[in-house]
Amino acid sequence: MIKMAVKFVVVMIVFAQILAPIAEAAQGKAVYYDPPYTRSACYGTQRETLVVGVKNNLWQNGRACGRRYRVRCIGATYNFDRACTGRTVDVKVVDFCREPCNGDLNLSRDAFRVIANTDAGNIRVVYTPI
């Protein structure tokens, strides 16, 4: 009986670890901005290129600075064939996207290109904290 209980607990822990990232994933829209990626709200001048600015709901009065997200394109916001590349990109929050911000995530052009065709301009994404 104890052996079965231990197996059950182990199985539950494994499922929790597998499903936790899925539960934290959010969907939203992403746009991009062109370089130079300087004068960011978090770090001033910085050299990283896989970066993102976030909207107010993610910004949390600057507490978002330094957070990392894994972002995946799931489709174009507008009718645009083959917007997504099928890849993911890991980005670091370095900026605040002030209203009117056209996306939940304002990706650097370099980051956007990893996951989507820049001609799409505005895409639907899934993003997960990492």
UniProtKB/Swiss-Prot annotation:
CDD domains for the chain: DPBB_EG45-like (cd22269)
Protein name listed in UniProt: EG45-like domain containing protein 2
Pfam hit, one: DPBB_1
One of the record's GO cellular component terms: apoplast
Carbohydrate-modified residues: N106
Cleaved signal peptide residues: 1-25
Key words, A-Z: Glycoprotein, Secreted, Signal
SUPFAM superfamilies in alphabetical order: Barwin-like endoglucanases
Tissue and organ distribution: Expressed in unstressed leaves.
Domain Expansin-like EG45: start-end pairs: 28-130
MF annotations from Gene Ontology: peptide hormone receptor binding
Subcellular location: Secreted
Biological process terms in GO annotation: alternative respiration; systemic acquired resistance
InterPro entries documented for this protein: EGC1/2 (IPR044206), Expansin/allergen_DPBB_dom (IPR007112), RlpA-like_DPBB (IPR009009), RlpA-like_sf (IPR036908)
Gene from which this protein is expressed: EGC2
Function: Plays a systemic role in water and solute homeostasis.
